Every structure is written in structure tokens, then in C-alpha cells.
């Protein structure tokens, strides 16, 4: 059974039963926090965002119904499921009349419990449609605040610049903004500005006329036209070549696009969301990124935190991703061992969510057990340390190595090195600046 990701609070004064129920629900993909008394449960609610409370009925000091009453004072509408070994039909009727979502008798049938949880979460969902952000699995206060900002900015047409390390999910965030916007019925189109050569990127963005270049055998509309009425997502905008930055600025200023090889401007109605892992103010200081373009793109700035900055999301994400991978490949895989989850929680995650996805895919591919072991997670993490870099990362590393070799050969002579590279001195100095190389360091 597939369940909606949710954060559950379990309250029971029996530590053994509390642990058992917590393990069962965690194995189903829920994020769980526990409390051994009603008072402790209220303290948890004060410090954490919880989607649903499951409480035992009979507890010392504060029973389940008293806890329910206190919860409704501080969080009206919070769904509560009551479990009891001493239930009766009158008790159940009385509880539901007071607003308890469900009243289940112990020992609880697991399918009945899962169904009650799913029904409670479905019926207690906010009136506003949250499907716009369903691909973003989080309970991190940092991310939830960011999502609220995204929801607000989605209602206008201002340009948004998303900052964040590689693998943090910038494109998914851009898609969420589009989904929450009035443009959501129109196309969302993404392009990586650092993954294509300059002429090909120009043709992709702006289109081309027949005969514009060798191989242009017919007219072709660009992505600005393809995204008409919708959103164009410019990923890795910091890697866009300087000549195209000028053309992009003109498009943003005039709201018109001119295909390559054409003398005709075409009106466009497109919202721009861009993203980068680079420090664009530093790139501007080095002359690599246009200041006027930066301010056009950066009307609203959103910074996505690294996975290491929101470790509370790791169990939720890991279980969600495990469920997806298992459904595709091995449905018998159900959960992580306790030690495996601890290892996931303490890993450094330089590749962020993208790396977590890869690790879990590897674990599912290699396991023959319903439970992912700590040893398997360790093996997958070690494999990630030698994994292939992204295309942009590989290209940047090649450029760095190539420039170092040129400067070594020419003993720091920039004119000679630029000539060997087929670049003019200005372009070559920009390359050196981008990679923070000083030709003087190579002079003898």
C-alpha cells in the first residue's frame, strides 16, 4: 500500500507498545515522533509540525480524550485517532461525536489502521489544493517557510532566481512555482544553459530560420515560443555564454524574441524562472555575468538549503524514495534497518537529494531482503564517492585542467596561451578568472 508522506505523533504510556507501533508505521514510510504521556505529547506539538496524532485512550494523569480536548485548544482541526483495549460502541460513538477522527480497538488490524490514517490525512488536508508542491517531500521548518514564499510569489509574474547547490532540487522547486501559478495549465519547459554549446543553446532558446546555419533545413521555433503562456526555466543560468546574456536581456526587456537568421520579432508571453549553483555577485565582479541581466532575473531570490541543513527530512525522504524505487523494481523491499537509517542521517550528502536518490536506487537494486541493511547503505555511499560527475562538473574540471596545462606550457604567457586555445586575450582572462587562476603563478 502506498501512503501519503506524513509526520505522525504517537502517544502511549506503554513504552513497549509505543516502540512497536512506531517501528510498524516507520516501515510503512511515515515519519514518527513518540511521547509517553499526554503532557509530553503536547510539548511535541508545540515544537514540531505534526500531521496526525494517534493516542492510547487509557493513560495516567491525562487520558486520550483529555489529550484530544487539549489538542483542539492549541491546534483546532488536528486529526486524532484513539486506540484502546477497552473499547465499546458507546465509547466510539461518544468519541466521534466530540470530533475524534477514528476510534480503534486493540489489537489493531494494521490495514484498518493504515486506512484510518490515510483517510484522516485526506480529510484534514487544507482547503487550498496542495498538489502544486506534492513532489517536494519535507517537514523541515526551513523548507516549509521557503514553500510558503514560493506559493506567494507564484501568484505574480515576477522573475525568480533560485540558488542552491547541485542536487538540491532547483528544477522541482521551479516546477512547483509554476504549478501554483495562474499559468499552470500552460507549458513548463526547462533547459540547462551550461550543457549546450553556444550556437545550439541560442537556437534552442530563440529558434532559427531555414538556412540560418549548416543543417538548418527548416524553420524551428525556440523554447520561448514553445513555452508561450507558461514558464521557461533556465537552469544553470550562471553558465550562459556572455553573447547570449545580451540577447536574453533584450528578450526580457522587450518581451520579443528573434529567431536565428530571421529579421522578424515575435511577441512572447512567458514567465522566467532561473537557477544557479554559482555565486552570481562574484561572477559579476569578475565580469562573467551581466549586472543588468542579474537584476532582471533576480526580482525575487529563493535559496534552497543543502540536505545537510535539513537532516530532519532525511527519514521522510529516504522512506518516500525507497517506496518509489521498490514499486518500480522490488515490491518486497519494505524498510531500512535502524542502523541503516542512522547512517543515512549522519552522511554528509555533498550531492544532496540527487545523491540520496542514487544511494537508495543502488540499495534496492542490490538487496535480496525486505529490509535495507546498514552494510548495503555503507557500500552504496562508498560507491557514490567514485560516481561520475555531472556534465557541467566534468566540463568545468576539464577547463580547469586544460588552462593549467596551457599556462604550464607557456610559462604564464597569456598571449601565447590564448593563441594556443584559439581565444582572444579578453576571453582567456575571463576563463582564468572563472577558475580563479593567476598566470603569474606559472611564470618562472
From Swiss-Prot:
PROSITE patterns listed in its UniProt record: RESPONSE_REGULATORY (PS50110), SIGMA54_INTERACT_1 (PS00675), SIGMA54_INTERACT_2 (PS00676), SIGMA54_INTERACT_3 (PS00688), SIGMA54_INTERACT_4 (PS50045)
Endpoints of the signal sequence: none
A GO term for molecular function: ATP hydrolysis activity
Record-listed ATP binding positions: 164-171, 227-236
Record flagged with keyword Oxidoreductase: no
Response regulatory domain sequence ranges: 7-121
Residues modified to 4-aspartylphosphate: 56
Changes after translation: Phosphorylated by GlrK.
DNA-binding region boundaries: 414-433
Keywords: ATP-binding, Cytoplasm, DNA-binding, Nucleotide-binding, Phosphoprotein, Transcription, Transcription regulation, Two-component regulatory system
Localization, UniProt: Cytoplasm
Function: Member of the two-component regulatory system GlrR/GlrK that up-regulates transcription of the glmY sRNA when cells enter the stationary growth phase. Regulates glmY transcription by binding to three conserved sites in the purL-glmY intergenic region.
Name of protein: Transcriptional regulatory protein GlrR
Gene this chain is encoded by: glrR
Amino acid at each position: 500500500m502506498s501512503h501519503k508522506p506524513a509526520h505522525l505523533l504517537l502517544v502511549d504510556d506503554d513504552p513497549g507498545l509505543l516502540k512497536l507501533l512506531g517501528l510498524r508505521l516507520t516501515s510503512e514510510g511515515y515519519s514518527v515522533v513518540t511521547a509517553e504521556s499526554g503532557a509530553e505529547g503536547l510539548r511535541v506539538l508545540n515544537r514540531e509540525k505534526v500531521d496526525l496524532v494517534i493516542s492510547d485512550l487509557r493513560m495516567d494523569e491525562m487520558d486520550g480524550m483529555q489529550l484530544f480536548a487539549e489538542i483542539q485548544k492549541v491546534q483546532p482541526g488536528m486529526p486524532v485517532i484513539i486506540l484502546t483495549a477497552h473499547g465499546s460502541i458507546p465509547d466510539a460513538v461518544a468519541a466521534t461525536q466530540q470530533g475524534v477522527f477514528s476510534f480503534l480497538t486493540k489489537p489493531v488490524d494494521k490495514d484498518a489502521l493504515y486506512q484510518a490514517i490515510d483517510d484522516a490525512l485526506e480529510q484534514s488536508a487544507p482547503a487550498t489544493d496542495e498538489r502544486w508542491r506534492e513532489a517536494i517531500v519535507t517537514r523541515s521548518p526551513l523548507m516549509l517557510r521557503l514553500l510558503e514564499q514560493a506559493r506567494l510569489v507564484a501568484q505574480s509574474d515576477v522573475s525568480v532566481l533560485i540558488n542552491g547547490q547541485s542536487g538540491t532540487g532547483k528544477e522541482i522547486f521551479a516546477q512547483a512555482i509554476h504549478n501554483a501559478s495562474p499559468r499552470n495549465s500552460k507549458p513548463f519547459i526547462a533547459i540547462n544553459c551550461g550543457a549546450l554549446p553556444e550556437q545550439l543553446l541560442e537556437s534552442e532558446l530563440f529558434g532559427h530560420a531555414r538556412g540560418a546555419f549548416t543543417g538548418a533545413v527548416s524553420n524551428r521555433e525556440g523554447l520561448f515560443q514553445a513555452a508561450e503562456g507558461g514558464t521557461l526555466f533556465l537552469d544553470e543560468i550562471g553558465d550562459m555564454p556572455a553573447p547570449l546574456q545580451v540577447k536574453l536581456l533584450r528578450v526580457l526587456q522587450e518581451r520579443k524574441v528573434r529567431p536565428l537568421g530571421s529579421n522578424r520579432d515575435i511577441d512572447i508571453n512567458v514567465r522566467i524562472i532561473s537557477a544557479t549553483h554559482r555565486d552570481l555577485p562574484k561572477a559579476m565582479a569578475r565580469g562573467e555575468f551581466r549586472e543588468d541581466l542579474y537584476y532582471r532575473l533576480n526580482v525575487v531570490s529563493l535559496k534552497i538549503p543543502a540536505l545537510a541543513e535539513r537532516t530532519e527530512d532525511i527519514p521522510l525522504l529516504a522512506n518516500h524514495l525507497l517506496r518509489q524505487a521498490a514499486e518500480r523494481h522490488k515490491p518486497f523491499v519494505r524498510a531500512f534497518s535502524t542502523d541503516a537509517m542512522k547512517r543515512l542521517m549522519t552522511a554528509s550528502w555533498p550531492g544532496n537529494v540527487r545523491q540520496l536518490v542514487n544511494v537508495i536506487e543502488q540499495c534496492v537494486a542490490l538487496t535480496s531482503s525486505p529490509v535495507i541493511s546498514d552494510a548495503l547503505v555503507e557500500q552504496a555511499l562508498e560507491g557514490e564517492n567514485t560516481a561520475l560527475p555531472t556534465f557541467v562538473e566534468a566540463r568545468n574540471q576539464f577547463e580547469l585542467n586544460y588552462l593549467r596545462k596551457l599556462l604550464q606550457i607557456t610559462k604564464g604567457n597569456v598571449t601565447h596561451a590564448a593563441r594556443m586555445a584559439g581565444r582572444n586575450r579578453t576571453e582567456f582572462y575571463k576563463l582564468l578568472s572563472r577558475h580563479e587562476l593567476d598566470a603569474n603563478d606559472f611564470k618562472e
